[in-house]
Amino acid sequence: MYAFVTGANGLLGSVVVRTLREQGHAVVGSYHSEEPTFDCPLHQVDITDTERVVELLDEYDVDLVINCAAYTDVDGCESNPEVATAVNGTAPGDLAAVCDDREIPFIHYSTDYVFDGETDGFYEEGDEPAPIQEYGRSKLTGEHAVRDVNPDALILRLSFVYGARGDTSDLVGFPQWVASTLAAGDTVPLFTDQTMTPSRAGNVATTTLELLDAGVSGTFHVASQSAVTPSDFGEKICEVIGGDATLIESSVMADLDRPAARPRRSCLDVSNVEGELGCSQPTLEDDLAALEAAFSDYSS
């Protein structure tokens, strides 16, 4: 029997696939466009094509579905709300219903962007969502769609997912951009007025499987203990690679003209997941240390 991972070519999906395989699980993955480089069954599938997904669940006798597929381009969602709703809202509910009918676990990932960011503290799972852009609204629709049809589903909210890919071990996203720009000796403008609790993909994958083993359901926040701005984050990356800190320039969100609004402070409280598993979520320093090998290409 297999674990079925949607979005296997994304950062999070690729790390989930790797972590499952490292723990001895058979995996079948789906991807939307570019095929990842895993030695396991992989299929190009549109996540909104529920009929095709069901065919794969039957073909591989799947006994676990982890939905990593999402439309995560925040500004793209603002311009394409119908696509955002279909991928982030409707499709997760359809998958959750299929899993409920088959009585197999369903795990779905959501986002800190379901909150408006108008807080000076940390959001708990039970706090009232109030998304301020189409991306957050579509992800909240997905949460409701999943919960309405599958009360046993596990929904994990994440914040600013980053890390190294599961298939190639290459650093991607924000840390790769910061590290490569600093290594090239160029300036890096980073926001000082946005605060989040970044979720390292490797920790998310490990925590996901720990929660699965614990047999829990409901909504949990999985993120760093550390509340940081992009500027703070960049400074820590600079320390890791031995870069020139004077290249980091302060910036604010208003400096960029972007279609979608971003929450000012979308920090996630991780007390519930820590209490459930009996261990702490990592600090940013812990997470960056776990990526030491991936940063080595940019170290001076």
Swiss-Prot record:
Keywords: NAD, NADP, Oxidoreductase. It is an enzyme of class 1 (oxidoreductase). SUPFAM superfamilies: NAD(P)-binding Rossmann-fold domains (SSF51735). One of its GO terms (molecular function) is oxidoreductase activity. Pathway: Protein modification; protein glycosylation; Cell surface structure biogenesis; S-layer biogenesis. Disruption phenotype: Impaired formation of the tetrasaccharide present at 'Asn-532' of S-layer glycoprotein Csg. No effect on 'Asn-47' and 'Asn-117' glycosylation of S-layer glycoprotein Csg. The active site is at 135 (proton donor/acceptor). One of its GO terms (biological process) is protein glycosylation. It comes from Haloferax volcanii (strain ATCC 29605 / DSM 3757 / JCM 8879 / NBRC 14742 / NCIMB 2012 / VKM B-1768 / DS2). Its EC number is 1.1.1.-. This is Probable low-salt glycan biosynthesis reductase Agl14. Reductase involved in N-glycan biosynthetic pathway that takes place under low-salt conditions (1.75 M instead of 3.4 M). Participates in the formation of the tetrasaccharide present at 'Asn-532' of S-layer glycoprotein Csg, consisting of a sulfated hexose, 2 hexoses and rhamnose. Involved in the addition of final rhamnose (sugar 4) of the tetrasaccharide on the dolichol phosphate carrier. Belongs to the dTDP-4-dehydrorhamnose reductase family. NADPH binds at residues 11-12, 46-47, 70-72, 109, 135, 139. The keyword Mitochondrion does not apply. The keyword Nucleotide-binding does not apply. NADH binds at residues 10-12, 46-47, 70-72, 135, 139. It comes from the Archaea.
